Amino acid sequence: MVGETRDGETAGISVRAAITGHLVLSTLHTNDAVSSIVRLADMGIDHYLIANSLVGLVAQRLMRKVCPHCGREVAVTPQEQALLGKDITTIKRGTGCTHCNGTGYRGRIAVHEIVTIDRNIRRMISRGAEIEEIEAYAREQQGMRSLKEKGLELVKQGVTTPEELLRIAYYA
């Protein structure tokens, strides 16, 4: 287990360990799962080695949950409706209470973006395919959904708020 891969030296050691059959778990700072490929390449790792050392990519964010004690249905603002879609007219928002220390939030929920590195993705990585191509394949063939899509669904379900969605998917 590697705590965090921040530089080329750590990335190289991790890739060599993975190539020789060791399961290596590490973290990278990226906006989404597929961007990990670019990040490793930026650290000087050859595309062929990236393709053959990865088995999966996971992006994870924690979203604060609306407090179940003070959460109330409220009308969306025009800005929120632009973000959420015209079909959404109400959302759940905490008003603040003793259970949530006045924040309107209590607890967190994990949102994941998962990509399995299969034979086709290995080929794409090896030939230096654009991230958009790999992402499109993961969506179409693996059913991958982005952090933003999953977060949006949680807002629609009343689990969290548009502010939390913007916080975890600021780049989208």
Which stretches of residues belong to each language-model region?
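Short, flexible helix-loop junctions that flank or precede catalytic/ligand sites
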Residues: 1-172
